[in-house]
Amino acid sequence: SSSPMHELNQGVTVVTGGAGLIGSAVIWGINNQNQENIWLVDECEDDSLKKRNLEHLCFRRILGLGEFRHLVSQNSPELSEIRTIIHLGACSSTTETDEDYLHDNNFLYTKELCEWSLCNGVRFVYASSAATYGDGTLGMDDKDEEIEKFQPLNLYGWSKHKFDLLARKEGWLDQITGLKYFNVYGPNEEHKGDMRSVVSKAYEQIAETGRMTLFRSHRHDYRDGEQK
């Protein structure tokens, strides 16, 4: 079969969360394949750190989250040229406690885009998360029959896991592509504040103080700071 990058030659590619760490890198990668027929979906305030992530990217259109969801809910003719959705937009805070917000922004939003994509013959790639695996003791095997046993440790993980479970129940998993990211770091994450990667925070700490703070250990066989 043809590669995903080859398929991006056709029609519009939508990247949700396109101004974020991963989304901006994905658009940069697509641009490097000489493709610019991209719609970027994100919330970007003028003069924000997020807006800076867009400076060197090429895309045809930028839409806010609410605007895009509305077009999808109406099955608007405006969307007829879309051939691929790369859905990376979500609340990625592992400490978020507003369950209703996570349910709407992470679960329902993904469900809406997936259903629309399947109804319209659009390729759908979405970000799940390694947070769905919980503490790892139940394995990390994403075979269909294994997915249900996972026990995420936080509401963010559950918001992602709920969609994976729905996709399995509805028989969507062989028609869509889910990506489970572990720790991601690199350029364009400054806007994430306290949710930046360990690498980003450590670099800043070392540059300022010559030292870095490590996480406390939650396992008896590793002392604090000795995790590897």
Please provide the spans of the model-predicted regions.
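Conserved Rossmann-fold NAD(P)-dependent oxidoreductase catalytic core, especially the SDR/UDP-sugar
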Residues: T84-H87, E112-L155
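Short alpha-helical oligomerization interface
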Residues: T94-Y109, D144-P152
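Short-chain dehydrogenase/reductase
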Residues: Y101-H103, P152-H161, K192-S200
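Glycine-rich phosphate-binding loop and adjoining beta1-alpha1-beta2 segment
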Residues: L40-F68
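NAD(P)-dependent short-chain dehydrogenase/reductase
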Residues: L138, L165-K228
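N-terminal Rossmann NAD(P)H-binding glycine-rich loop of SDR-like oxidoreductase domains
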Residues: T13-Q33
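NAD(P)H-binding glycine-rich loop region in Rossmannoid oxidoreductase-like domains
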Residues: L65-G66, H70-N105
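Short alpha-helix in the Rossmann-fold core of NAD(P)-dependent oxidoreductases
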Residues: N105-T110, V125, S159-K160
